[in-house]
A protein has these predicted regions:
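Sec-dependent bacterial lipoprotein signal peptides
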Residues: 1-21
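Bacterial signal peptide processing site
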Residues: 19-25, 133
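Alpha-helical segments in soluble extracytoplasmic regions
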Residues: 32-103, 107-126
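Short, low-complexity, Pro/Ser/Thr/Gly-rich segments in the mature regions of secreted, periplasmic
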Residues: 124-136
Length: 136
């Protein structure tokens, strides 16, 4: 009788233990993002204020920061989301670089491409925030 009770308790509590590990893994994975998120905030403010001499370089550094964080993340859900955000920062960097290379020749299409890249980045960054449970 006692064995059955113990077996039932172990069976009932085992999923909770596994879930706890998953949550801890997700939490530690999301903690790796604190540096890149701070860098992203500063870079965006500087770019918006026109203080960044080369926004493309700033955005490339952000992509690298996310890639560095991703290398330390083992949670597959968070890692996939971080990798997507890093790729989006690279795309934004390329589009910004194309515009800043010759601002006099910036056409409407290049501007729209950059805006679309930022929208895509915003979508994926928001998904990452939801994955990590960040409130904003």
């Amino acid at each position: 009788m006692k064995r059955r009770i113990v077996a039932a308790l172990v069976t009932a509590l085992l999923p909770l233990g596994v879930t706890g590990c998953s949550i801890a893994s997700k939490t530690s994975a999301c903690e790796e993002l604190s540096g890149p998120l701070k860098e992203a905030g500063v870079a965006l403010v500087n770019a918006r204020l026109g203080e960044a001499e080369n926004p493309g370089e700033s955005f490339t550094k952000l992509a690298e920061a996310y890639e560095t964080a991703s290398a330390k993340i083992t949670n597959s859900e968070v890692k996939a989301s971080v990798d997507q955000v890093a790729a989006d920062w690279r795309t934004v960097a390329e589009k910004a670089q194309a515009l800043s290379a010759d601002p006099a020749k910036a056409d409407e299409e290049k501007i729209q491409d950059l805006q679309a890249a930022f929208e895509q980045l915003n979508t994926h960054q928001t998904e990452l925030f939801h994955t990590c449970g960040y409130k904003y």
